[in-house]
Amino acid sequence: GTPCYCGKTIGIYWFGTKTCPSNRGYTGSCGYFLGICCYPVD
């Protein structure tokens, strides 16, 4: 995936969705350009 930042926290950018994939163990997210940024990086 594409790296993105929630403040100073690096995450993975998911285009075209407003929710993080639930099976990857993400603990947080923030809204991002046309999608969502989910962290921590897996």
Curated annotation (Swiss-Prot):
Q: What is its main location?
A: secreted
The record's keywords, sorted A to Z, are: Disulfide bond, Ion channel impairing toxin, Nematocyst, Neurotoxin, Secreted, Toxin, Voltage-gated sodium channel impairing toxin
Query: SUPFAM superfamilies from the xrefs?
Result: Defensin-like
Domain comment quoted from the record? Has the CSbeta/beta fold, which comprises anti-parallel beta-sheets stabilized by three or four disulfide bonds.
Q: Give the family, as the similarity comment puts it.
A: Belongs to the sea anemone type 3 (BDS) potassium channel toxin family.
Extra information: Negative results: has no effect on Nav1.5, Nav1.7 and Nav1.8 sodium channels and on Kv1.1, Kv1.2, Kv1.3, Kv1.4, Kv1.5, Kv1.6, Kv2.1, Kv3.1, Kv4.2, Kv4.3, Kv7.2, Kv7.4, Kv11.1/KCNH2/ERG1, and Shaker potassium channels.
Record-given protein name: Delta-actitoxin-Ael2d
Organism of origin: Anthopleura elegantissima
